[in-house]
Amino acid sequence: MRADREELDLPPPIGGVAIDVVKVEVPATGRTLVLAFVKTCAVLAAVHGLYILHEVDLTTAHKEAEWEFEPLAWRVWLVVFYFGCLSLTVWLLEGSYGGSDHHAARAQSPDVRARRSELDDNIAQMGAVHGLELPRRQVLRRRGT
């Protein structure tokens, strides 16, 4: 669009076909919400697993029957699971509150809309300043010859 709101009819690039490719990017708020949801689900799954293993450990400890080695094996797995859940929780919370800068190191994606509007402005200014060159045939048609 030029300053006088006249539509510019620009020829396509070399090859005769104009292709407009727009990179679709998920908004930052959407990414943040999905990340928070995934982290919450991971913590809830870990807490649920801890609850189930604790219940199994309590039921095997209360039996005090013929098993002598089994409760010890369950307790080892329970300690490993506790360690895994605590590590997962610390890792998730550390990433949320800026403990690591792996998100800051990611390059900011270009704003396609701003770049396109800037390009349109440049094209419009070029047309307004220099005028549009029409082929000789169109100039002659406009004059009526």
Swiss-Prot record:
Induction text: Expressed in the intermediate phase of the viral replicative cycle.
Chief localization: host cell
Protein name: I-leader protein
Record-stated family: Belongs to the adenoviridae leader protein family.
Gene Ontology cellular component annotations, sorted alphabetically: host cell perinuclear region of cytoplasm
The UniProt record lists the keyword Transcription regulation: no
UniProt miscellaneous comment: Very stable protein with a low turnover rate.
Cellular localization per UniProt: Host cytoplasm, Host perinuclear region
Organism of provenance: Human adenovirus C serotype 5
Keywords annotated in UniProt: Host cytoplasm
Domain of life: Viruses
Pfam family, one: Adeno_52K
